Amino acid sequence: MPKTEFQDLDYQFSIEIVKNIPIELKNEFKTVLSVIDKELINYYYELKKDPKINYLICIEGNHIGYSSIYEDDTYWNLYEIYIKEEFRELGLGTRLFQFIKNNCQNEGKQIRSYTLPSDRRAKNFYESNMITARVLIMEDKRAKSRYKI
């Protein structure tokens, strides 16, 4: 199984494939997402398939982030990528993403990701990693939308 280790910021990091993501990380991800738009989050979870590949990133053995992927004939569909708040803006999400992307390309596949339109941070992350939007779902504006017209 692919695994990588690297030294950065005077810490030892590792990224590896695991069978299951630790529940505390999954719950933290759901909590962070829930502030965006509960209706969209529910829709997202209806679309999401069970992951086939889970990546876990650790700092000196402590879980700090993960990614879940569903593989089909053409794509590795990246449904979730999450780094704990205190470890963001350090390039760790990019390291995790690049490791996944390299493994994906080694399998002869393309990478595809799903994110919510109101998640500006995710949009910026993907664009900085050379991933661009291809599809938008448009609907009537909701009363509790984060955006003003």
Give the label of every model feature segment.
Residues 104-116:
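Conserved GNAT acetyl-CoA-binding A-motif
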Residues 83, 89-102, 124-128:
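Conserved acetyl-CoA-binding loop-helix of GNAT-fold acetyltransferases
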Residues 1-42:
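Short amphipathic alpha-helix that is part of the acyltransferase structural core
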Residues 74-85, 114, 139:
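Conserved acetyl-CoA binding element of GNAT-fold acetyltransferases
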Residues 94, 117-136, 140, 146-147:
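Conserved active-site alpha-helix within GNAT-family acetyltransferase domains
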Residues 33-56, 68:
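Active-site rim helix/loop that mediates acceptor-substrate recognition in acyltransferases
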